[in-house]
Amino acid sequence: MSPKESIELQEFQSLLQDEAYEELINKKTYEAIKYRSNDGILPIIITLFIFSFVISRMIIFFISLFNKNTYCELPAVADAIINSIALVCIIVILYFSSRKLNVEIRRGEVEDYRANLERNQR
């Protein structure tokens, strides 16, 4: 490890132990979660719509399955295909709505935040 990398690592470790750094991380995380929750209603609505569609198709499938007067092999295959496509859509939507949350702190931002805290405490 070069001396420059060693000094940067020591600076980073000292920042991690700083109380202002923890407060800044909590603040940034809260803002990121708030921003994501504002955008998160559309995937929930689409997921509920697809889920209700799957449930209604399953109900129709079971009614036609237990009705002895109809030939239900073709509707059963169609229902299985439609339900599997809808379930894949639900899984994809849930995957994208639960993606990893990234919090970014730029160099010097901790010092600025610490200075603002000290100014506000006076």
From Swiss-Prot:
The chain crosses the membrane at residues 43-63, 76-96. Its main location: membrane. It is found in: Membrane. It is a multi-pass membrane protein. Keywords: Membrane, Transmembrane, Transmembrane helix. It comes from the Eukaryota. GO terms for cellular component: membrane. This is Putative uncharacterized membrane protein C622.06c.
